[in-house]
Amino acid sequence: MGQKTHPLGFRIGITRDHKSSWFSNMKSYPKLAQEDYKIRSCIEKQLHNASISLIYIDRKVDQVQVHIHTARPGIILGKMGRGLEDLRKKLETTLKNDTQIRINLIEITDPDKEATLIAEFIVQQLEKRIAFRRVIRQAMQRSQKAKNQGIKIQVSGRLNGAEIARSEWVREGRVPLQTLRAHIDYSYKTAHTIYGILGVKVWLFKGEKIITDKVDN
């Protein structure tokens, strides 16, 4: 049986960075890791329609900086910036400690270059009961317009309400999953339909990164 490696974890330290940036001793590490999980879960639950592709967490001694990469910053800001303040208070309540939280919004100018946002688009269309092949074709066209070098989409489950679940995938361009220097963006989402849950996976190939760091002998 072939073993599948997670395309993002496989490239950490080469073409990808960790989604959190902080150091801790062994005693505090589990607590801080759990806090990161709570922050991400709270943001994703409250802002599920804000087209968020990445939540990056940076910690200092008594401060947590949360960088939210979003294609729709207006939804997070709300009227007169109240939405951002409400989110900050909600996060402070969730953590239940005296840690100061600062939120920084980073706007995504081209959402079709983000695997997470393409996967979200596919999920939204599938939940509206649009035929999966048509949805995949639309996603492929959007990726082509964004000039990605390659894209692979896989949809699994009871496709179009079929009795037996199956998987179908389509690839266009190059998606070199075994090349470590390849800049691959990956996302997995689930669509909840009347026939059950459909799994959606998207791989995007954005080009190769030249690795310049050399180890001195």
Swiss-Prot record:
Q: Where is the KH type-2 domain?
A: 39-109
Q: Does the keyword Cell division apply?
A: no
InterPro entries given in the database record: KH_dom, KH_dom-like_a/b, KH_dom_type_2, KH_sf_prok-type, Ribosomal_S3_C_sf, Ribosomal_uS3_bac-typ, Ribosomal_uS3_C, Ribosomal_uS3_CS
Q: Name one Pfam family in it.
A: KH_2
Could you tell me the keywords of this UniProt record? Chloroplast, Plastid, Ribonucleoprotein, Ribosomal protein, RNA-binding, rRNA-binding
Q: Which domain of life is it from?
A: Eukaryota
> Has keyword RNA-binding?
yes
Any GO MF annotation of the entry: rRNA binding
Q: What is its main location?
A: plastid
The places in or outside the cell where this protein is found are: Plastid, Chloroplast
> Which GO CC terms are listed, alphabetically?
chloroplast; cytosolic small ribosomal subunit
| GO BP annotation list | translation
- Subunit: Part of the 30S ribosomal subunit.
Family membership noted in the UniProt record = Belongs to the universal ribosomal protein uS3 family.
Put simply, this protein is called Small ribosomal subunit protein uS3c
